[in-house]
A protein has these predicted regions:
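Short beta-strand-to-turn element immediately C-terminal to the catalytic PLP-Schiff-base lysine
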Residues: 2-3, 156, 164-167, 192-198
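Conserved N-terminal alpha-helix of the aminotransferase class I/II PLP-enzyme fold
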Residues: 8-56
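Substrate-binding/gating loop at the entrance of the active-site cleft, primarily
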Residues: 56, 76-92
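Conserved PLP-anchoring active-site segment centered on the Schiff-base-forming lysine
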Residues: 64-83, 105
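Active-site phosphate-binding strand-loop segment of PLP-dependent enzymes
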Residues: 97, 101-148
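Conserved active-site segment immediately N-terminal to the catalytic lysine
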Residues: 163-183
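Conserved core segment of the aminotransferase class I/II
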Residues: 180, 187-205
Length: 205
């Protein structure tokens, strides 16, 4: 994708219209119609309600997790998660537990405490892949939010939709789910995106 001539030609045309940089923060002058159009298209493509662009996948993980998780919350995360997920969890100051790779946590959060389960979909170092059904069931049973870093699944697995494709095809009830995808892997560009329920994406915005 990064060297596809059609992509390069389109980028060249758009640069002449919109310029090279945003010249401001997103809340002021840093967004244009292209940002909104891309968010809408990515949300529709993955079957999610809404999407929010970030400048990188690393910052998407930090921004989303640090905004949603408080010190009073509990976080359960795979022991082989990417550094961006580990950094984000540590920055929240929350109570956190690392569970065995590709398993589910052995104990839930205390009653009355909000909890999150954070994992990658495809682990970058060895290619291991999660079982979305097992994690979804755990989150339903324990009222946890499921956060999935799909950097290495999006654009490759699930007809290109990544883990979102598998989650859409799960039968029965689904937990609250957030998915982070990157634009710099299979799509050959740059940036990160957090996808999920509109009310959460609006909060992050």
């Amino acid at each position: 994708m990064s060297s596809n001539q059609r992509v390069l030609d389109r980028v060249s045309r758009e640069l002449k219209t919109f310029g090279f940089g945003s010249a401001g923060a997103a809340l002021l002058t840093g967004r244009c119609t292209l940002h909104s159009e891309l968010e809408l298209k990515l949300a529709d493509y993955t079957g999610q309600e809404s999407a929010l662009l970030f400048s990188s996948g690393y910052l998407a993980n930090l921004g989303a997790i640090c905004s949603l998780v408080s010190k009073e919350d509990w976080v359960f995360h795979d022991r082989l998660n990417h550094a961006s997920l580990i950094d984000a969890v540590l920055m929240t100051g929350s109570r956190h537990r690392r569970y065995p790779h590709l398993m589910v946590p052995s104990n839930p959060a205390p009653i009355g405490r909000k909890s999150f389960l954070i994992t990658e979909s495809v682990f970058s170092m060895d290619g291991d892949k999660i079982c979305p059904n097992s994690l979804s069931n755990y989150c339903i049973e324990n009222n946890s939010t499921l956060y999935i870093d799909d950097a290495h699944g999006f654009g490759v697995l699930g007809e290109g939709q990544g883990v979102a494709y598998e989650l859409k095809n799960l039968s029965g009830e689904c937990p609250e789910i957030l998915i982070m995808i990157t634009l710099g892997k299979a799509l050959g560009s740059s940036g990160g995106v957090v996808l999920g329920p509109k009310r959460i994406i609006d909060f992050l915005t």
